Structure formats: structure tokens, C-alpha cells
Amino acid sequence: MMQPLYLVGPRGCGKTTIGMALAQATGFRFADTDRWLQSHVQMSVADIVEKEGWGGFRARETAALEAVSAPSTVVATGGGIILTEYNRRYMHRVGVVIYLCAPVSTLVNRLEAEPEADLRPTLTGKPLSEEVREVLEQRDALYRETAHYIIDATKTPAQVVSEIIAALPPSTQRLQGDVYT
């Protein structure tokens, strides 16, 4: 059994897309903390924040993180999961944390192209490019502090997955169908 692999980074860096591809490449299970949370409370992130505030959402996010953390699982986390010190320590201690790093321009382009963008609550109330820049400035150091590996997420999903697999210890690089020794 291998440690969970946690993907962290801002909105639009590709945590879910890369996570699913990485899980397929490694034979691991895939989990997404935001999706798990939404399916268990039957509300969108925006609805949770509206009803419970960011503090309530962050508490639920921690519960989701603990619930989906399991050996041999790739976990796509919410962009703000690193704001809670407990979450940073937990992920760093329990698993391998990978920061999917991308510049503001890439993040904005991806977010503008997402059909579910309206389901995400604004973090600052500012235009998207300003919000992404501000949020990344506030969180980048926390992503870096938490990560075991920092990966350039501007490439294609296949390239990013290959870079992640190359960075991981050999025991984690087994492809589906390989024999674990």
C-alpha cells in the first residue's frame, strides 16, 4: 500500500484533471475533496459558503480531507485547503503532496473556459484576473511549504502526469497491472 498523493494548488491548476489521469496511470483510486463534500451535504461550495460562511466550509473541507485519505489514492484538494494549518500538516505527514504550479494567466484562461465556474463563490469580489493574482500571492508560500514536489502545471495533462510519476519514489511509479514487490 502506498501513501495517498495529494494535489494542491489554486483554482484552475488542473488538480481534478491531473488527478484522474494520475490515478489511471498509477492504478490508484481517485478522490476529490470538493466533490466528496458536495455529494455528502447535497450543496454546492457556493451554497455551503452562503449558508455556513467560509469557516463552516473550511471545517467541512477538513472532514472531507480525512474521509477521502486512504492508501493508494490520488486526492484532488480544494484550492484553499492549505489555509488550515491542520490540513497542511496532515497532508504532509500522511501522504505525498504535489503542488501544481501555474502562472496567473494560465489559471485565468482555464477558469474562464470552465462551464462550472459560476458554481464557485468569489473569494474577493474582484474581477477574475485580479482575484486569481491576489489569491495566488496569498497562498503560493503555503502551497510551497506543504509540497514535497512542485510541478509545472502549464503543460498537457499527459506531460504533467509523466513529470509527477518521474518525481515520485520508484515504489509509487507502478503502472496498473504491475506487480508490487
Swiss-Prot record:
ATP binds at G12, C13, G14, K15, T16, T17, R120. Its EC number is 2.7.1.71. InterPro entries: P-loop_NTPase, Shikimate/glucono_kinase, Shikimate_kinase/TSH1, Shikimate_kinase_2, Shikimate_kinase_CS. Mg(2+) binds at T16, D32. One of its GO terms (cellular component) is cytosol. GO terms for biological process: amino acid biosynthetic process; aromatic amino acid family biosynthetic process; chorismate biosynthetic process. Its main location: cytoplasm. Pathway: Metabolic intermediate biosynthesis; chorismate biosynthesis; chorismate from D-erythrose 4-phosphate and phosphoenolpyruvate: step 5/7. It is found in: Cytoplasm. It is an enzyme of class 2 (transferase). It comes from the Bacteria. Its cofactor is Mg(2+). Substrate binds at D34, R58, G79, R139. Keywords: Amino-acid biosynthesis, Aromatic amino acid biosynthesis, ATP-binding, Cytoplasm, Kinase, Magnesium, Metal-binding, Nucleotide-binding, Transferase. Gene3D superfamilies: P-loop containing nucleotide triphosphate hydrolases. Binds 1 Mg(2+) ion per subunit. One of its GO terms (molecular function) is magnesium ion binding. Residues 112-126 are annotated as: LID domain. It catalyses: shikimate + ATP = 3-phosphoshikimate + ADP + H(+). The LID domain closes over the active site upon ATP binding. Belongs to the shikimate kinase family. AroL subfamily. Monomer. Catalyzes the specific phosphorylation of the 3-hydroxyl group of shikimic acid using ATP as a cosubstrate. This is Shikimate kinase 2. It comes from Salmonella newport (strain SL254). The lineage of its organism: Bacteria, Pseudomonadati, Pseudomonadota, Gammaproteobacteria, Enterobacterales.
